[in-house]
Amino acid sequence: MPIITLPDGSQRQFDNPVSVMEVAQSIGAGLAKATIAGRVNGERRDACDIISEDSSLEIITAKDEDGLEIIRHSCAHLLGHAIKQLFPNVKMAIGPTIDNGFYYDVDLDRSLTQEDLDAIEKRMLELAKTNYDVVKKRVSWQEARDTFEKRGEPYKMAILDENIERTATPALYHHEEYIDMCRGPHVPNMRFCHHFKLQKVAGAYWRGDSKNKMLQRIYGTAWADKKQLAEYLTRLEEAAKRDHRRIGKALDLYHMQEEAPGLVFWHNDGWTIFRELETFVRTKLKEYDYQEVKGPFMMDRVLWERTGHWQNYADLMFTTQSENREYAIKPMNCPGHVQIFNQGLKSYRDLPIRMAEFGSCHRNEPSGSLHGLMRVRGFTQDDAHIFCTEDQIESEVTSCIRMVYDIYSTFGFSNIQVKLSTRPENRIGDDAMWDRAEDGLAKALTANGLSYEIQEGEGAFYGPKIEFALRDCLDREWQCGTIQLDFALPGRLDASYVAEDNGRRTPVMIHRAILGSIERFIGIITEEYAGFFPTWLAPTQAVVMNITDSQADYVQKVTKALSDAGIRVKSDLRNEKVGFKVREHTLRRVPYMLVCGDKEIEAGKVSVRTRKGADLGTFTIDEFVEILKNQVKARGLKLLGEE
């Protein structure tokens, strides 16, 4: 006679074991109709699963985040159902959920085309609209293997052979004649899976290993209702317009090429943005009392073994050899900063020491994961490490948090998600060390009034971390800033200071990055601003143009005045109509266009227009120089006339 406790604290008693759906039906027909699955004692379960003992239960509907994920997972099975009908010889591999959707890896003897995707999507919709029930059956390991052997599914058999214990009872989900294997849960009926869209096909190696066969990965998105799907597709269209790769090419910011995968060739205008970001961060380093250092980009393997990187991070490290010694190109800056700290005796009176570097790092990311500036192999971190005592942890982490919010606000980011990532399975240090480190970060977050989400097992191998994720104008999340507490690395590298009692102590090390990878941050703000960089960041801040040749000397005079004032300015003296010039520089997202005609020369002024088409009227040269200097100095986000 299980007693079921509901989220509001009310209880329901049943004479016999009861399914999640039956509990929902006992509450009301409306809830039963909306039920996708349940959360039994915090664990997600199918609607058909039986509850035989006293339990807490929360019904999952399409309004819940879990409900939407289940819909997406079931759409992956629906994709399998449809593609099997259209291509009976296809072999199904894996079909998990991802952000905003799902994918399925399939093995087919020919490449899928857009026409194929359209046909698969059409068949999926036809099947879903029959509103068939999804039937879950638990079977023995052998029965599951026999099922997939009969159906000619080698990848499902491999999953059983390599990933599932022989004593397990795998769940098979029956979609009419199609059968898939999954942990679940899944929707009880396909009426929940009417709103989806197949998006693209890409290559993917089986199990992510390039030694294995290349499969075809079909991507899709799925939502709870028609409106959500339409809104998402609109956001995708806007994201495509804002794609930093497209804008980067149009604005001549950078390029990448096959001979240097994951490495950036910065062009003049892109490098201008890069240097402006460095300059801005340097002003903040001075404000928050950091010293700036520079470490070598490569160090001996022996050092990386002492830090634990060689054992825990080797797959992502580039290595080289010289004179019978093995070196690693640094994937991060922290070991080098400890070496700088170790030069000379340090006292507790010297702490905290805040050490910052624009460190050039390299990580051997899989080629399939590389994506423009967002995922690269060579990048520059606005990295810092703070050496302090345990008593200083909370105040130093608080200072880091303030610096994070200070810097992000300059770029207009105010919606910031905070996450606390705890100890991973593969780590250094004992549990007592991790307890202290996790507790230290949690206390600092609480003291600063920040709500946060805990990410179990997502910390670095050497310490837990706070992550700051930015929400952009398209409601996408970008993880940028991190604050990590490290009790292990300084001790491994023999860092110490003389304490107040004259004894030797190991300092605590706080790892801190705000922009994260500068390359990636440029990609993020390129998309956030759609290439319309605020004046202080714009590679060219103003263009001065003539109407006829007779104004050429005056244009040069205005250009020189702006350039002498530190404004990034160009002159355009081409023999083209002024409207043509304005359009061209508007497409280049230049903030201000200064037009010089005979009237402007006579008045000693310039006529000013913005890239958004606003006519600001006329200004004397000195007036406009002063206005622009002040705007750049303030690092404002808006142009004149946009206030």
From Swiss-Prot:
Cofactor note: Binds 1 zinc ion per subunit.
Biological process (GO), any one: threonyl-tRNA aminoacylation
Catalysed reaction equations from the record: tRNA(Thr) + L-threonine + ATP = L-threonyl-tRNA(Thr) + AMP + diphosphate + H(+)
Family: Belongs to the class-II aminoacyl-tRNA synthetase family.
E.C. code: 6.1.1.3
Record's subunit section: Homodimer.
Protein name: Threonine--tRNA ligase
Role this protein plays: Catalyzes the attachment of threonine to tRNA(Thr) in a two-step reaction: L-threonine is first activated by ATP to form Thr-AMP and then transferred to the acceptor end of tRNA(Thr). Also edits incorrectly charged L-seryl-tRNA(Thr).
Residue ranges of every copy of the TGS domain listed in the record: 1-61
Pfam families hit by this protein: HGTP_anticodon, TGS, tRNA-synt_2b, tRNA_SAD
Keywords: Aminoacyl-tRNA synthetase, ATP-binding, Cytoplasm, Ligase, Metal-binding, Nucleotide-binding, Protein biosynthesis, RNA-binding, tRNA-binding, Zinc
Cellular component GO terms held in the UniProt record: cytosol
Cofactor: Zn(2+)
Subcellular location: Cytoplasm
Any one GO molecular function term: ATP binding
Primary location: cytoplasm
Residues given in the record as Zn(2+) binding sites: C334, H385, H511
Domain of life: Bacteria
SMART domains the record matches: tRNA_SAD (SM00863)
Region (Catalytic): 243-534
